[in-house]
Each structure stands twice: as structure tokens, then as C-alpha cells.
């Protein structure tokens, strides 16, 4: 499969495609899809024994502030296999900075055609409060034991900000 041939979404910025790299609650292994070879590589074994609280991936054909495709966490009832692509709807964004610069994480739920479980989730604040806290705690601490790496949480914004980040990253990719 060539991720570069997958559009960023079906109805941008409301309906996006996310290539999953790391399933929710998976062993603390950081996988990354190499954008040139479309191969799923082990990037590193995480030093902190923490699990991603939701499926982690990126929107194809986007370019975020850190020079990589825009990161997305997709909240689902079950872990999604690495390498698969899921249709999703953005509901918020966790703004953060790390050792590589700006590193926002869009928060999304499956498109309504995939699951009716999240039909009433319009904003990230509609998700369980504990899940929101777990996501923030994970990203605030997941690099703690890695030399030279750091993360600063800048705060949360809603679905409008997530859609704006998607639109910006699509435009940046197109140059």
C-alpha cells in the first residue's frame, strides 16, 4: 500500500483518513511508517512503560509544524491494527511542544459510518474526563526517561481548532 496515494480525507477537514502506526493499549513500542518506503518500522522501545491511550497515527499528505505528517489519536472501542487506515472525525487538539518543535495531536473518533458509539461526541470534552486526563498524562510523561527529549503541554482546543490544524497541514503539504 502506498500511503502517499491515500488522500487526507473524504470531506476535509471534517472527514479525515488516519494511517494507524500504534494501536491503543499496545506494548510500549514506538512504530513509524516510513513515508518513502511505506514500511512500518520499529522506531524505538519506549523507556517509560506506558501505553498509548488511543490509536496513534497520521493524516496522509499533510505537513505539520514538526516537518512530519499531522499526528492524530483516534479513540475507538477496540485497538486498530498498525498499517490500517481509518476514516475519522476530528473533535479536538492537544497542543504541545517537544524537542523537535510544535507537535500538536489531533483527537478524533471513528466516522459515524464506522461506529454509532461516538455519534454524540462533537468536541473532545464530550469524551470521558478520565480519558482526556489519560491522554494528557501520557503525552506529558512518555519521553521522561529518554535522554535529551522533553515535552511541554500547551493546552487543549476544540473541534474548530482541530479542523484549522488539518486545513493548515494540508496547505503546507501542497506547498
Swiss-Prot record:
Record family assignment: Belongs to the PPase family.
InterPro entries, alphabetized: Pyrophosphatase, Pyrophosphatase_sf
EC number(s) on file: 3.6.1.1
Name under which the protein is recorded: Inorganic pyrophosphatase
Binding site for substrate: 30, 44, 56, 142
Subunit relationships: Homohexamer.
Annotated PROSITE patterns: PPASE
Cofactor(s) needed for function: Mg(2+)
Record flagged with keyword Cell inner membrane: no
Residues binding Mg(2+) 1, per UniProt: 66, 71, 103
A GO biological process held by the record: phosphate-containing compound metabolic process
A GO term for molecular function: magnesium ion binding
One Pfam family cited in the UniProt record for this chain: Pyrophosphatase
Subcellular location: Cytoplasm
Enzymatic reactions: diphosphate + H2O = 2 phosphate + H(+)
EC class name: hydrolase
Keyword list, A-Z: Cytoplasm, Hydrolase, Magnesium, Metal-binding
Organism of this sequence: Pseudomonas putida (strain ATCC 47054 / DSM 6125 / CFBP 8728 / NCIMB 11950 / KT2440)
CDD domains given in the database record: pyrophosphatase
UniProt-annotated binding residues for Mg(2+) 2: 71
PANTHER family per the UniProt record, alphabetical: INORGANIC PYROPHOSPHATASE
Lineage top rank: taxon: Bacteria
One GO location term (cellular component): cytoplasm
Amino acid at each position: 500500500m502506498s500511503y502517499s496515494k491515500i488522500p487526507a480525507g473524504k470531506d476535509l477537514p471534517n472527514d479525515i483518513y488516519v494511517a494507524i502506526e500504534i494501536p491503543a493499549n499496545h506494548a510500549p513500542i514506538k512504530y513509524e511508517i516510513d513515508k518513502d518506503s511505506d514500511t512500518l518500522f520499529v522506531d524505538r522501545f519506549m523507556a517509560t512503560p506506558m501505553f498509548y491511550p488511543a490509536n496513534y497515527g497520521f493524516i496522509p499528505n499533510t505537513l505539520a509544524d514538526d516537518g512530519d505528517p499531522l499526528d492524530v489519536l483516534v479513540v475507538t472501542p477496540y485497538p486498530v491494527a498498525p498499517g490500517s487506515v481509518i476514516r475519522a472525525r476530528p473533535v479536538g487538539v492537544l497542543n504541545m511542544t517537544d524537542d523537535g518543535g510544535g507537535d500538536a495531536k489531533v483527537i478524533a473518533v471513528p466516522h459515524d459510518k464506522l461506529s454509532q458509539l461516538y455519534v454524540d461526541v462533537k468536541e473532545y470534552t464530550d469524551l470521558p474526563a478520565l480519558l482526556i486526563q489519560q491522554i494528557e498524562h501520557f503525552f506529558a510523561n512518555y519521553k521522561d526517561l529518554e535522554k535529551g527529549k522533553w515535552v511541554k503541554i500547551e493546552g487543549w482546543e476544540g473541534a474548530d481548532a482541530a479542523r484549522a490544524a488539518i486545513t493548515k497541514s494540508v496547505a503546507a503539504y501542497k506547498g
